[in-house]
Amino acid sequence: MARIAGIDLPNNKQLQIALTSIYGIGRARALEICRKTDILPEKRAKDLDNDEVNKLRKIIESDYVVEGKLRSELAMSIKRLMDIACYRGLRHRKGLPLRGQRTKTNARTRKGKRKTVANKKMAAK
């Protein structure tokens, strides 16, 4: 089992798919990594030898920001927006959509489960 960037790659999957189990690597980037290391993307992860695993590890660690470092960069970016109190930071703080979507009827995913207001119908009358 190949271990790259602190993640065990699934053995039975093709390399291009197995690499996507690393946070920060999608299909396009996985193919790019395979092309840089001259390893066939269709090769199974269990069939990789130590040289190939070391090549992959070296390319990923030197050229790409993945896993914990990427997560912390994203968190710091959001924290910076909240600290400078810009519009996007305020929306992050309130847990609302950032990019101009309507919130009167939609945005349930971002806002969370509905919170019922007691006696709302009585107040409307």
Curated annotation (Swiss-Prot):
Pfam families: Ribosomal_S13
GO cellular component: cytosol; small ribosomal subunit
Keywords: Ribonucleoprotein, Ribosomal protein, RNA-binding, rRNA-binding, tRNA-binding
GO molecular function, one term: structural constituent of ribosome
Region (Disordered): 99-125
Organism domain of life: Bacteria
Example of a GO biological process term: translation
Assembly with partners or alone: Part of the 30S ribosomal subunit. Forms a loose heterodimer with protein S19. Forms two bridges to the 50S subunit in the 70S ribosome.
PANTHER family: 30S RIBOSOMAL PROTEIN S13/40S RIBOSOMAL PROTEIN S18 (PTHR10871), SMALL RIBOSOMAL SUBUNIT PROTEIN US13M (PTHR10871:SF1)
Function: Located at the top of the head of the 30S subunit, it contacts several helices of the 16S rRNA. In the 70S ribosome it contacts the 23S rRNA (bridge B1a) and protein L5 of the 50S subunit (bridge B1b), connecting the 2 subunits; these bridges are implicated in subunit movement. Contacts the tRNAs in the A and P-sites.
Entry's family note: Belongs to the universal ribosomal protein uS13 family.
Protein known as: Small ribosomal subunit protein uS13
Top-level taxonomy: Bacteria, Pseudomonadati, Spirochaetota, Spirochaetia, Spirochaetales
